[in-house]
């Protein structure tokens, strides 16, 4: 997937991400990238970035408005979206993650997975089985991230390390 957005860093609230599914996390990230690029962005901009249907994104946006720092102003001809960056309990991810050649559910997983990293590091102290159990993803999603070279598993298989530059922002 290659997008026409300049690379930018987006701060994402950890408790919000932990409450989302992989698909919702992907949509949330793409929405924030669209807003960062163009404050007058619409739902169609998010549809163009994600490739997800407008109905699905609309349903996700309703949830984001309830649990996230996303505000939707419905007073004009079209909805206006704004985002308040978190000041604590956040991770920062670069929009270049969208340029990776992996499924959107893998990107959503990586966005959520970043929440479990050690403070000021790119290491997640979870084994594969704990990731599946605690984060609620399937083994093949984790293997897809490994095969794409976005994360690396330690030799003793006790932890994972982010290696893609978009995920290595501290």
Feature-to-residue mapping (PLM):
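Short recognition helix of helix-turn-helix/winged-helix DNA-binding domains
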Residues: 1-45, 56, 75-125
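Extended low-polarity, hydrophobic cluster-rich segments
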Residues: 28, 32, 106-111, 140-146, ...
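Short amphipathic alpha-helical interaction segments
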Residues: 52-66, 136-148
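A short, conserved structural fragment
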Residues: 65-75, 147-160
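Charged low-complexity intrinsically disordered patches
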Residues: 1, 133, 137-143, 147, ...
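Minor-groove-contacting beta-hairpin "wing" of winged helix-turn-helix DNA-binding domains
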Residues: 76-84, 157-168
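The alpha-helix within a helix-turn-helix
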Residues: 47, 132
């Amino acid at each position: 997937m290659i997008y026409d957005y300049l690379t930018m860093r987006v701060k994402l609230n950890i408790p919000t991400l932990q409450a989302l599914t992989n698909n919702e996390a992907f949509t949330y990230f793409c929405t924030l990238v669209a807003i960062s690029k163009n404050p007058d962005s619409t739902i169609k901009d998010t549809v163009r970035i994600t490739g997800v249907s407008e109905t699905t994104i609309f349903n996700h946006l309703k949830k984001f408005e309830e649990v996230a720092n996303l505000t939707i102003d419905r007073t004009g001809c079209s909805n206006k979206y704004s985002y308040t960056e978190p000041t604590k309990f956040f991770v920062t991810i670069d929009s270049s993650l969208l340029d990776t050649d992996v499924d959107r559910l893998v990107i959503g997983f990586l966005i959520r997975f970043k929440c479990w990293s050690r403070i000021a590091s790119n290491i997640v102290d979870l084994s594969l089985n704990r990731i599946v159990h605690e984060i609620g993803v399937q083994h093949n999603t984790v293997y897809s991230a490994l095969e794409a070279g976005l994360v690396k598993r330690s030799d003793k298989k006790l932890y994972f390390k982010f290696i893609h530059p978009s995920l290595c922002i501290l």
